[in-house]
Amino acid sequence: MGLARTLAVTLTGLAGHIVDVEAHSVQGLPGFTLVGLPDTAVRESRERVRAALSTCGVTWGEQRLTVNLSPADLRKTGTGLDLALALAVLGARGRLGRSAAGLLGRTVYIGELGLDGSVHSVRGVLPSVQAAVAAGVEEIVVAQEAAAEAELVPGARVTAVRHVGQLVERYGGRLSAAVAAAVEQITEAGADDAPTTPTRDAELPDLADVVGQSEARQALEVAAAGGHHLMMVGPPGTGKTMLAERLPSILPPLEQTDAVTVTSLHSVAGIFDPAHGLITRPPLRAPHHTATRAAVVGGGSGLPRPGDVSLAHRGMLFLDEAPEFSAGVLDCLRQPLESGMVTIDRVGGRASYPAAFQLVLAANPCPCGKAGGRGLECTCTSLQRRRYFSRLSGPLLDRVDITVEVGAVSAADLASAGSGESSAAVAQRVRRARRAAERRLAGTPWRLNAEVSGSYLRGPDGGLSAPLSRRLMTALERGDLSLRGVDRVLRLAWTLADLEDVDTLALTHIGTALALRTSGVRP
């Protein structure tokens, strides 16, 4: 009889849970039983482990194996438990040295096994290693291709392997000469690959490329400085998409905590490239208007994966041709816009992901796109226009802080092309405004004006004088603003004050904020 224990990690959202992998081997009818709420991928690991260990010369014989994944009431997902299962089986079968027992129980193993015993990377290595370090685990063993990602976690003691046979030899086990030669061949073949080193991101498009559109450029700057949601309405070809794609170029780099969270989300989604290192730039996600709810919000079979709203965390979600998106997809944005989180329930479990993104919408003024265009006559009826914008519900639009009209470019604008400010110059003002907001909001849970609660803004610490309050109440009574709209105007006003580097609100700030909020182009 043999008993061995190793450690693994399973993920629920971004939260990693340490899993005890206990293997028990006794004489009897050959069998391999896996218990402890494994999902399909984990159940299939029995065959991968069996094949991988057979390449190391481990035969089952007349042994009955039982592997328990503890805690038993936590659903285990993914193929990342393969390596821990294999080491537990080897320990239970007595194929490792005597000193291995203590090491196995203090080490987390993260990796998928190939049928030849090779070790491959899996999704979610970064948050898994974070969970292991937080639990005080001494060592984390990962696939060689995941080493760069695992080493992004401070304090992680990472060991990288290419073949399970390397661990057999490390823990005092013996391999036949033929197996040892095969392991060495696989290891050397992988060593010939170029090492993964961080590469520079491609240069972001510059705001200086935009011709004209001074009002839209100002709206973009205000949105960047305060983290406000933005909607641009205008005929085709006026530069709406061009402006939106340049918003990331004027946003400050991510703080360390946010960079780790964003990188973890991309790792869980399986789209993180370790060659680029930690993601330090605000991400940009621009789903097509045919995208489904699962693609935008998150979902999938089994445990849900993050969608575009989470992959845009601390960055920007750009919906071009916004009225073309399905109403269901657009309405699903309301919860994350308000809370900065998205919770997805499935039969296989529940997952919560951060989703504090900046929403940017772009739309034509009508289905034909000619309304507002110079020298163009709109052919749409009023009913067609209403239907076109009907998917953009009132509650969603009420959460958009800024609405700006992007008009047709004139010949004079084209003649002065290239004279606009660069992204670097605008980004400098944005950083200065954000620092001013951070100083003012010191001691509060908020960093950006767009995050500040309405009760705080309207309270004694919000800096709202009686004349400013009367101006807002007048707009509220006229029906120009909802109560949520009042709060959003105040957030915009403080951003305008921060851009001017002043400590108090003035009527001019409220007036400009009202103009940005209640533009006549709002559908």
Model-identified regions with their sequence ranges:
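The Walker A (P-loop) glycine that initiates the GxxxxGKT/S ATP-binding motif of P-loop NTPases
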Residues: 234, 298, 321
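Loop/turn-to-beta-strand initiation segments
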Residues: 138, 228-229, 313-317, 339-342, ...
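Peripheral, non-AAA+ core regions of ATP-driven protein-machinery
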Residues: 1-231, 235, 241, 345, ...
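Conserved alpha-helical scaffold flanking the Walker A/P-loop in AAA+ ATPase domains
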Residues: 221, 277, 282-283, 294-317, ...
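Walker B catalytic acidic pair
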Residues: 314, 320-321, 332
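Basic, amphipathic alpha-helical bundle interface domains used for macromolecular binding and assembly
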Residues: 35-46, 61, 68-78, 304, ...
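Short loop/turn elements that form and flank the Walker-type P-loop nucleotide-binding site
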Residues: 60-63, 103-104, 136, 154-155, ...
